Amino acid sequence: TWIMRSDIAPHEASKKGLDVSVCGSCPLRQAIGGACYVTLHQAPLAVYKAYKKGLYNKAVDVTRLKGRKLRMGSYGDPAAIPFEAWEAVAQYTNGNTGYTHQLNHKAFDKRLLDLVMVSADTPKQAAKYQASGIKTFRVKVESMPLLKGEVECLSDTQGISCIECKLCNGQNKSVAINVHGRGTKAHTLKYGKGL
């Protein structure tokens, strides 16, 4: 799923700092120099343009999702969408994955924790969340060890895609992945000391 504004292209929203409505307080937002991996001028922009041309139905028959796998927020934070909408969709799917940085937002709906992982930016933050029973997803520098109870992302270790793995659904184990892609340098500079 693509969570984006309908009034401005995603890459423009990011450049202007108007992506808060879809990304919340995520520290990985490109607008604030974060290491978000989403290439906004590619797939998200294509989806936005298709929407503006009227190629997306405004009403969706969620039963058509029966047996399909759901990525909650290929771009955008799932917390930007009411829990009831996700619940209505997820009941028909064959598994889901998703991540949120909004756990500490005053309006965060904790029911979402049954469907998504909480993104943790540091080992200390991950350990704090995990101690309260929350499943976390953490991007780490390769030299950093896994925390007790964490598993390494199967994409890293076995080349299994997220949608096939489905471990990141808020119900299984906490997961950590080695930083990769174009945000590696920025992430390593900000979080490389493992605080």
Annotated model-derived regions:
Residues 1-195:
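Class I S-adenosyl-L-methionine
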